[in-house]
């Protein structure tokens, strides 16, 4: 019912936004029949015989983590060292904790010293040995359908490809290019948008370039 109301653009009688409190309350509603829908998917029908009702949200928000590989050791963490021309490997993991995963879009933003390698992207679900070959689109630059113009690339997942409690691993790579800052960091940040207007916190990794020039004087 909630999905139908959204698809038919049925305007809500009242909207309440949770700003961090444990509870939200609808006030001054006339008696009648109501369908209450949360952004995480909880539904509750309320009728005139029970004007006070409590809705407990059992769904959780999806979680995104991100790591970068240190070339010298092969270990994964929040930062690494590299030289110009090195390929940098990343992996991000989405845990679909929400009750009805939909409208999943993975957003990635790389700083100027990193060049995204689109052909290096692989997506795995639930520790599968082979990556997905369909069910998502990769959009870069100013491609039509891209939601955040500032992002380097986005992965748009088709509804139905990800289910509740699925774990989605995204593996990809970039080159440290000539714009990389010396003795400073290049950043790679990711977040996920989902549902009607949900958004996870931003996860960031850092790559440090310790290259230095050699000068000869005569």
Task: Please report, for each region that a protein language model flagged, where it lies by residue.
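Solvent-exposed loop/turn and edge beta-strand elements of beta-rich ligand-binding domains
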Residues: 1-218
